[in-house]
Amino acid sequence: LSASNEKPKVLPSHSLKQVIVEMTQKRLGVTAVVDEQDHLLGIITDGDLRRMLKDNVQIDKVKAADIMTVKPKTIGPDELAAEALNVLRQNEITQLVVTDNGLYIGVIHLHDLLKEGFI
């Protein structure tokens, strides 16, 4: 998990502004969308935000649930870093959500693996 990982997360009902603030504060380019018990419902990435803005939606009405990617790629907390890297490469993504039985644990970022010498 990212050393600076403070578990970026929002609720589905959170506004676009709340999503952007969370992503900016946690500095991972992604936030998980969870329910009140921290079950993972989806993720929102910087790319999701850019695509949403390109579509000229009414941003004052957008909620996290409206723009999240459901069923994101995940990995378990006991998986090896090599497996995380394999999932990132195969899916051409830079972040991977860590879950344990559907509960949100955190985010592994490609930069984490780079810093630790796995790449």
Placement of each model-derived feature along the sequence:
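Bateman (tandem CBS) regulatory domains
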Residues: L1-K7, K61-P72
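Phosphate-coordinating loops and pocket residues in cytosolic domains that bind phosphorylated ligands
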Residues: S2, K54-D55, T69, K115
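Short gly/pro-enriched beta-turn/loop segments at secondary-structure junctions
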Residues: S2-N5, Q18, T24-L28, E36-H39, ...
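The conserved cystathionine-beta-synthase
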Residues: K9-R27, V34, L53, T74-T94, ...
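A beta-strand-loop signature enriched in Asp, Gly, Thr, and Trp
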Residues: V30-D66
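Short hydrophobic beta-strand segments in globular cytosolic domains
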Residues: L40-L41, T99, Y104-I105
